[in-house]
Amino acid sequence: MTRIVGIDLGTTNSLVAYMKDGQPCVVPDRNGRAMVPSVVALTDNGLIVGDSAKEHLTRNPERTVYSVKRFMGKGLTDVQSELAYFPYQLTETGGVIRIRLGEKTYSPPQISAMVLKELKRRAEAYLGESITKAVITVPAYFNDSQRQATKDAGLIAGLEVLRIINEPTAASLAYGLQKHTQGTIAVYDFGGGTFDISILKLKDGIFEVLATNGDTHLGGDDLDRLLVDLFIGQIQEQHGIDLSGYPDHMQIVRLEAERAKIRLSDDLKTKITIELPNDKGHFTRELTREQLESLAIPVIERTLAPCRMALKDAGLTPKDIDEVVLVGGSTRMPLVRHRVEALFGKAPHCHLNPDEVVALGAAVQADILGGGTTDMLLLDVTPLSLGIETMGGVMSSLIRRNTTIPASAKELFTTYVDGQTGVDIHILQGERELVKDNRSLARFRLKVPPLPAGVPRIEVTFLIDANGILNVTATDMRTGQSQSIEVKPSYGLSDTEVERMIEDSFKFAADDVNARKLIEARLDAEALLKTTNKSLTEAGHLIAAGEAEGIRNALSQLTTAKDAADPRTIRARMADLEQAAKHLNVVMLDDSLRKSLQGKKVTEVT
């Protein structure tokens, strides 16, 4: 049976998971790390993804892309207020956001596909088999455009996306599998760039989503920005430096803000140290948890309104909730947990790793689709109402939000003008009454014979599949003529573009693998050169002159090999250097131990 993996494609980090002996497990890298930073960087050697790309955030910020999930299925006008926070260049072509990296531009699905390819490669290396099918998670409040963009990313990465599943729902699957529980649960999902709340009923292996709500532009990134604005303002005030003109230092500030936020989940205070440009020294200050929380309160309070709305839509009160499950790294903040407990009147469930639980649940759903797990059934819902434009610029909803999917709905419409020869079907998504306040998904035209107004009968059918993606058919009931469309997002990619990207991914697959091997070898070589040079400088006097000269020769040979285009040669010279420096490393360790024990009594070290 072909293995199907579960993927959590996150704003900050992404993970891939699989089922082993009936339990979901995340796939680690060779260093045991499960999370792949959702970062892509363009280097002189090509595109890199993950941890190695993250290192370029401060080195080369204009050519390093992060938080691309915030742009999925969106146009430039949707994210106008955020542009100042991103050092890389964003443009728009045909309503699609494009991200410039060097001479080329990429759409958000293309960047996301690079992250998915890395997850695919990691899973294949770990499991020892080809991976071609996956379940990918999205925020529950992602609209049709964003879901289609995610599916496009999977296709470009060479994955057959069997199911798009909502992140809170995935988390509930992992939770239900572990706890074997019954009852009503609330899944509070506060990630890097999005927030979701879902209310589910668990009974006899059936996971029924009762209601969902959220904000696809609310997450840990927003907390980081509060600190960034604070630090930048204080640097301007104290040192007279406007960091907005220094993209590399802006990234240093952003990363320090993120690290400080994380530290303050465990500590009551932390020290902030930020290097200033042009050798102007450092900005330092102490930041307390209380100060962070005073800044964060408005952001965290914004998560509570969707919670109340979801409860209302489900016809429940906080007392009806049996368990609250926390998902997403941002839920590690003590203030978040305190506010969630205050809202629901019970301490949240914190035993599952909030960073991994979504990927684990996706693996469970993948196993269900593959026929491995047969005693669990998932009944998800559509997060937003779907409908069409009617006379006067009003939206008529056919499928209401929180309807269990897959779902279908039909409604009859007619013409309003005598002799009308066609009907324009304008498909919308949203909760507002007027067309202008909702999101336009697609338009198409149905031809009708010229008849008096009100005579034609046009049946419009909406069919939303288990991925939350919509198909619409309009039929003239008098003639039987119909017109159908699979709704493509206004800010999405055309079929031709996606097909071209998929063809390119296969066409250049071998070149991509070789380029990747070369990039990885060069990066590893640079790291080895740096550490060995440092060791030789600090401890060269502890070894014989001839041995030190041998290390220098090996360093020189690796430096030369690093610029070649053969990863095997680079790896061979790395092995030579590691062998040449083996005794130096032992001597350094002995010297370090000797210094640490110097002057101590036996009783102090036993």
Predicted regions and their residues:
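Oxyanion-binding/catalytic loops of NTP- or PPi-dependent enzymes
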Residues: 1-95, 101-114, 121-606
